[in-house]
C-alpha cells in the first residue's frame, strides 16, 4: 500500500505559476477587519482586496486572530496571505454568500459563492500557513435533514441540487 508518492513531477503543472507582485502590502485590519470570531469582517477584508487590486496588485495580510467572514473575491494581481495564527471562520449564514452562475456536479446553475473565490481573474492567489475553517456542519445538517424527506418521496438525487451549501474555495475560469 502506497501512502505517499515521491514522484511529484505533476506538481509543476498545477497551481499558480507565479505569485502576484508585492507592489503593495495592505493590512485588512486597517480597513476595519476585527480579530473577533463574533464580528463579521467580510466587508473590511474585501475592501482591502479591492484597494490592493486598484493599486496595481500586491498582498493583503491580517493580524493573528480569528476572523468571521462571508464570501471573499480575490482580484487579479492580489495575494491573500493567511499567516500562521490567522484563521478565517466561515459565516454560518447562507445570506453571506451571494449566488451566481457556477458549475456544480457538471451542471451550470445558480449557487452560493464559496468562502474564497477566484473567478475570471489572473495572477491571483491565497498563501500562508493560516487556516480556513469552513464550519460546514450547519449546511450539512440541513442537507441530511432534507435528504431524509426527499428519499421518502423517491427524490434522493434532487436534494443534491435543492440544498445549497457553501464551498470552501472556488477557482473558476482563472489563469496563472
Regions found by a protein language model. Give the residues of each.
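Extracellular/periplasmic carbohydrate-active domains that bind, remodel
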Residues: 4-176
Amino acid at each position: 500500500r502506497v501512502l505517499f508518492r515521491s514522484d511529484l513531477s505533476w506538481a509543476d503543472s498545477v497551481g499558480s505559476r507565479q505569485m502576484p507582485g508585492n507592489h503593495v502590502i495592505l493590512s485588512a485590519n486597517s480597513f476595519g477587519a476585527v480579530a473577533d470570531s463574533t464580528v463579521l469582517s467580510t466587508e473590511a477584508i474585501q475592501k482591502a482586496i479591492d484597494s490592493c487590486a486598484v493599486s496595481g496588485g500586491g498582498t493583503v495580510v491580517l493580524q493573528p486572530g480569528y476572523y468571521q467572514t462571508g464570501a471573499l473575491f480575490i482580484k487579479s494581481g492580489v495575494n491573500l496571505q493567511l499567516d500562521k495564527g490567522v484563521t478565517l471562520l466561515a459565516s454560518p449564514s447562507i445570506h453571506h454568500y451571494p449566488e451566481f452562475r457556477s458549475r456544480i456536479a457538471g451542471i451550470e446553475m445558480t449557487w452560493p459563492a464559496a468562502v474564497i473565490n477566484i473567478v475570471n481573474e489572473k495572477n491571483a492567489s491565497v498563501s500562508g500557513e493560516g487556516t480556513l475553517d469552513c464550519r460546514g456542519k450547519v449546511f450539512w445538517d440541513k442537507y441530511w435533514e432534507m435528504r431524509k424527506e426527499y428519499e421518502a418521496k423517491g427524490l434522493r438525487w434532487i436534494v443534491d441540487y435543492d440544498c445549497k451549501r457553501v464551498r470552501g474555495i472556488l477557482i473558476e475560469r482563472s489563469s496563472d
